[in-house]
């Protein structure tokens, strides 16, 4: 018992101690809570004082509203607020929003002053650089106007009251998203990033570069490209400014890019936003249709059911908020189920007794309207339901105007004082304020089902309703968006004269796009220009608003107007409205003869003069690397000096691949080379002897062999004569061709003209590589992107200038742009002085001798040329078409020619010259325009180089490793490299280039070979080049030189 008593005393002591500790903790908690309460009270008091200060500032600001319109007024004057430069703009905006209701405190940050919303006065040192224009983006060079962040911070921290800014402020909305660091300008940090649909301020006028100085709502300041923003309409801004008188308006509305441009954007953000429904980080783009509009009539507010009796009710309301100068409100209409029961004059009373109602059996909708000089207000903006079976939930929920990405939701509210919460697919989407009963969804997904729930939120508990009726607050509706269909067509299509006489410029206004680039749910990719149902131009850019169209295409279609369609992955839109082409633009220009220079335009003082008219289309292309470039064609048909350097940079150096496996020592490498050389020597010797005997027995071909022809000092190019071309043809006998004889060809790819092209390009390529001693690299710091030739499909490799000649198609194809050395490095003094003198001769100067060429392929520069100015400068032609050429080709490999009374450029690798001695036959051929289909062409001699001026050493090397560039090469243009196996004997020409590559030949294939994969064959081993196939087949096999013929016969 004693132990139990002691134990009880011990427990009682511990209990007392615990109670003491608990009491101390409770006192500590009480003290902390009191401290927190005092802190909150102090904060509340401070905020109240701040509110009073801001209210006074706002009142002073409103007094100057006539002089400065924050939302885009016209006349401006300096705002005389001495504390403006030092007062943070967020405080001012908070005060403005507080006066209007619930503002955008959280959306506005930073420490910029309100004075910073006024354009700064230009400083003496401000000298903006010229505009560097690019399509769709505004460019500007580095400017002294771009101040550092420290300078702007110093200005913000300045306490001086001196006014530094003047100008007017405008509210804008971003049309598209824009990241300055992805743009073309040198100082992207001076520009503001934009998000489509977000608001920003710009102040002052646009500068000469097309930029505004602006500020985002978070305080960021910088330059804004003018073509990326839309100004808010002045009339809607004026209406928005008047809403400050309404105590229940908790938002600021501005005009924006709502559906069809007729509604407004709401700056408030929803509580929850589904990322799949809206793609705007700043908040939803969905709008409340009835918020503000140009013709909104002020409506009565806060209708109240004062008393409900068995046969009557008493209702009251508050007067409308009428903007100054809007108009006069004369009276009120009280309606019951859209029937006017009484009319009350304004100012008498705002209560009404409505009798003759059967409250126990019927439900009535009571509404109050304002009657004004501009019409009556919307009855649903001041309405309530009374009577039997009234519930809190809205009724008649419906969805209209459903498209691929948008829909309009509407309902009938039980009480116009209720706000409503919108749920989309069980996710809270947005809140609609009181007196609103419509909602517009944007950025929906095409072909998707949605479930909408509208939850009514009463402003006060409707105690007059039974409990079960008070609990019914929700209404549902389901709908599905339309499948992604064709996009909307462009608007406001216009046609104007182009930058050149041979083109016109078609402009349009793109359809309204979502921030993700959708129109009607279709992913917009570009725009196409059509004439008589045929596409004549195309631009691949979703926000493009203009493009150039060749007049020759319109003349050939005899089109007098054009339409524009929006292109998308889901198809094309319908045609836009037809835009007529001015008749004066459709008249073909009269061709002018081209003046003839007195000396060779491309000849330099250090190069012996040769007869260019006897060189083929590809001859002397390597000389263009060492001479100044011929001037580009101009529409005045006059030669001009070369222009400044281009904008392209040289391609990166070729990367030397590294062999896989254990490195091979020098001794082993030489042993491998000796073994491989001896292994193939005997078979190579026998094959070579067989080829030699075969060629010796055919004497007529020995004289035309490639090496013999090149080494012959008397060799001289002469095109096939017109007599040879037309001998036995109908054109040579009579002017008309009949008899349905045709070429025995499958297509341009398989024709003899194509074979001629292929042979000559192969020979020219090998000659250039041999002569240059390997691959030539760009040099110097200035580079020019020379015009790239249209490429016939019969060529199959990359030449030394990087041009690609793809195989495997039926006609010329588009090649990728390349960079080549600039001719400006060589200077103007390398050109003949007569070249510049002749450039300024009058049209009466001596004409260049005209030559006759025949087209080897069909060629449409609009779709096949890789050059950006192809539509304006290059000529289209068909296979077999006769082309009149003036002078020699320029450094880019283009002739200046004439077809269909139009002058332009012609790629030399797609035409062949016909030597004409008979002027009468030449004129007749020009009148004919095309070679007759039954013309037998007996012989065409193609371009040949007059001789090799340099002797290039050849060496034999053996491959130490297997190499397949498609698998092992780190370079992009793997087709320029050879595939080989260990032990293959490769002939290399010249020395190693600075990238570590040889130019070599294996099995009739020529290309680049990595030097670290090869070992030179010892001199004491006799090696004959083997034509035995390698273990790997080359991608683009070339015909053996032994099979080449120096003449080509067309079989009728």
Curated annotation (Swiss-Prot):
Q: Where is the composition biased (Basic and acidic residues)?
A: 146-156
Where is the stretch described as Disordered?
115-164, 584-615, 629-666, 697-716, 767-787, 805-829, 1029-1052
Where in or outside the cell?
Cell membrane; Synapse
What InterPro entries does the annotation carry?
A: FN3_dom, FN3_sf, Ig-like_fold, RIM-BP_SH3_2, RIM-BP_SH3_3, RIMBP1/2/3, SH3-like_dom_sf, SH3_domain
Composition bias, Basic residues: 1040-1052
Cite the entry's keywords alphabetically. Answer: Cell membrane, Membrane, Phosphoprotein, Repeat, SH3 domain, Synapse
Q: Where is the composition biased (Pro residues)?
A: 585-598
Residue ranges of every copy of the Fibronectin type-III domain listed in the record:
297-390, 393-475, 489-590
Ranges for domain SH3 come to 167-234, 848-916, 952-1019
What Gene Ontology cellular-component terms does the record carry? Answer: plasma membrane; synapse
Identify the Pfam families for this entry. Answer: fn3, SH3_2, SH3_9
**Modified-residue entries (Phosphothreonine), positions:** 841
Record's compositionally biased regions (Low complexity): 645-654
Enumerate the Gene Ontology biological process terms.
neuromuscular synaptic transmission
What does the sequence similarity comment in the record state about its family?
A: Belongs to the RIMBP family.
The protein's role, per its UniProt record: Plays a role in the synaptic transmission as bifunctional linker that interacts simultaneously with RIMS1, RIMS2, CACNA1D and CACNA1B.
Quaternary form?
Interacts with RIMS1, RIMS2, CACNA1D and CACNA1B, and potentially with other Ca(2+) channel alpha-1 isoforms.
Relay the domain remarks. The SH3 domains mediate binding to a proline-rich motif in RIMS1, RIMS2, CACNA1D and CACNA1B.
Q: What is this protein called?
A: RIMS-binding protein 2
Task: State the organism named in the record.
Answer: Homo sapiens
């Amino acid at each position: 018992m004693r132990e139990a008593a002691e134990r009880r005393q011990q427990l009682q002591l511990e209990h007392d101690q615990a109670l003491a500790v608990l009491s101390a903790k409770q006192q500590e908690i009480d003290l902390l809570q009191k401290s927190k309460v005092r802190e909150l009270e102090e904060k509340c008091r401070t905020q109240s004082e701040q509110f009073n200060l801001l209210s006074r500032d706002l009142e002073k600001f409103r007094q100057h509203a006539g002089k400065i319109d924050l939302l885009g007024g016209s006349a401006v004057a300096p705002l005389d607020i001495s504390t403006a430069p030092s007062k943070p703009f967020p405080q001012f905006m908070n005060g403005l929003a507080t006066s209007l209701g619930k503002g955008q405190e959280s959306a506005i940050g930073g420490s910029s002053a309100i004075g910073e919303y006024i354009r700064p006065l230009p400083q003496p040192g401000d000298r903006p650089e010229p505009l560097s224009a690019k399509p769709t983006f505004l460019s500007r060079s580095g400017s002294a106007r771009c101040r550092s962040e420290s300078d702007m911070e110093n200005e913000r921290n300045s306490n001086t009251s001196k006014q530094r800014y003047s100008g007017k402020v405008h509210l804008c909305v971003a049309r598209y998203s824009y990241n300055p660091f992805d743009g073309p300008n040198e100082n992207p940090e001076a520009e503001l990033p934009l998000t489509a649909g977000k608001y920003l301020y710009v102040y002052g006028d646009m500068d000469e570069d097309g930029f505004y100085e602006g500020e985002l709502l978070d305080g960021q300041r910088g330059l804004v490209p003018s073509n990326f923003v839309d100004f808010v309409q002045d009339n809607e801004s004026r209406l928005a400014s008047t809403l400050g008188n309404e105590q229940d308006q908790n938002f600021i509305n501005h005009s924006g890019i709502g559906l069809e441009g007729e509604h407004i954007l709401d700056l408030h953000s929803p509580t929850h936003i589904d990322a799949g429904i809206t793609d705007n980080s700043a908040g939803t783009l969905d709008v409340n249709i009835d918020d503000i509009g140009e013709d909104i009539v002020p409506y009565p507010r806060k209708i109240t059911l004062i008393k409900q009796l068995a046969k009557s009710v008493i209702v009251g309301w508050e007067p409308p908020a009428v903007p100054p100068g809007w108009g006069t409100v004369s009276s009120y209409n009280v309606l019951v189920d859209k029937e006017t029961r009484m009319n009350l004059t304004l100012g008498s009373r705002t209560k009404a007794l409505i009798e003759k109602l059967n409250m126990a059996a019927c439900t009535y909708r009571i509404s109050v309207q304002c009657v004004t000089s501009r019409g009556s207000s919307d009855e649903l903006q001041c309405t309530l339901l009374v009577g039997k079976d009234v519930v809190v939930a809205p009724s008649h929920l419906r969805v209209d105007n459903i498209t691929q990405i948008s829909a309009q939701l509407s309902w009938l509210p039980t009480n116009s004082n209720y706000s409503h919460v919108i749920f989309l697919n069980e996710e809270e989407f947005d809140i609609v304020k009181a007196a609103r009963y419509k909602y517009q969804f944007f950025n929906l997904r095409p072909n998707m089902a949605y479930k909408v729930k509208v939850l009514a939120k009463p402003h006060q508990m409707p105690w007059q309703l039974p409990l079960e009726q008070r609990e019914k607050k929700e209404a549902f509706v389901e709908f599905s968006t339309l499948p992604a269909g064709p996009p909307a067509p462009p608007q406001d299509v216009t046609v104007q004269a182009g930058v050149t006489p041979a083109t016109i410029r078609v402009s349009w206004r793109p359809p309204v796009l979502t921030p993700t680039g959708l129109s009607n749910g279709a992913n917009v990719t570009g725009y196409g220009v059509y004439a008589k149902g045929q596409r004549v131009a195309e631009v691949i850019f979703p926000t493009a608003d203009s493009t150039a169209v060749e007049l020759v295409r319109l003349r050939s279609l005899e089109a007098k107007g054009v339409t524009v369609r929006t292109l998308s992955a889901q198809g094309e839109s319908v045609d836009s409205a037809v835009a007529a082409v001015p008749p004066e633009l459709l008249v073909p220009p009269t061709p002018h003869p081209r003046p003839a220079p007195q000396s060779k335009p491309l000849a330099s003082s250090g190069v012996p003069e040769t007869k260019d008219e006897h060189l083929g289309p590809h001859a002397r292309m390597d000389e263009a690397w060492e001479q100044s470039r011929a001037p580009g064609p101009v529409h005045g048909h006059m030669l001009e000096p070369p222009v400044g350097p281009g904008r392209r940079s040289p391609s990166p150096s070729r990367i030397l691949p590294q062999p896989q496996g254990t490195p091979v020592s020098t001794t082993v490498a030489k042993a491998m080379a000796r073994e491989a050389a001896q292994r193939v020597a005997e078979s190579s010797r026998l094959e070579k002897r067989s080829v030699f005997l075969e060629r010796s027995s055919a004497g007529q071909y020995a004289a035309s062999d490639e090496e013999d022809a090149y080494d012959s000092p008397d060799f001289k190019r002469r095109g096939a004569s017109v007599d040879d071309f037309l001998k036995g043809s109908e054109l040579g006998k009579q002017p008309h061709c009949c008899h349905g004889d045709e070429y025995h060809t499958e297509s341009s790819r398989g024709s003899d003209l194509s074979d001629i092209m292929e042979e000559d390009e192969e020979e020219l390529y090998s000659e250039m590589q041999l002569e240059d001693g390997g691959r030539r690299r760009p040099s110097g710091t200035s580079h020019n992107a020379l015009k790239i030739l249209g490429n016939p499909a019969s060529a199959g490799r990359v030449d030394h200038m990087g041009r690609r000649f793809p195989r495997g198609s039926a006609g010329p194809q588009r090649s990728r742009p390349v960079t080549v050395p600039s001719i400006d490095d060589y200077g103007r003094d390398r050109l003949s002085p007569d070249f510049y003198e002749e450039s300024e001769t009058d049209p009466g100067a001596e004409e260049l001798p005209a030559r006759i060429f025949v087209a080897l392929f069909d060629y449409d520069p609009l779709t096949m040329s890789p050059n950006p100015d192809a539509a304006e400068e290059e000529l289209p032609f068909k296979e077999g078409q006769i082309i009149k050429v003036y002078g020699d080709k320029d450094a880019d490999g283009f002739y200046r020619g004439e077809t269909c009374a139009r002058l332009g450029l012609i790629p030399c690798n797609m035409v062949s010259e016909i030597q004409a001695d008979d002027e009468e036959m030449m004129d007749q051929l020009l009148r004919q325009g095309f070679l007759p289909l039954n013309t037998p062409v007996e012989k065409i001699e193609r371009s040949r180089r007059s001789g090799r001026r340099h002797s290039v050493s050849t060496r034999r090397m053996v491959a130490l490793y297997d190499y397949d560039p498609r698998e092992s090469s780190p370079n992009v243009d793997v087709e320029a490299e050879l595939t080989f196996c260990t032990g293959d004997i490769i002939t290399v020409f010249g020395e190693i280039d600075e990238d570590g590559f040889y130019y070599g030949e294996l099995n009739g294939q020529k290309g680049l070979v990595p030097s670290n994969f090869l070992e030179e064959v010892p001199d004491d081993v006799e090696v004959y080049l083997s034509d035995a196939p390698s273990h790997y087949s080359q991608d683009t096999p070339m015909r053996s030189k032994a099979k080449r013929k120096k003449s080509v016969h067309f079989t009728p």
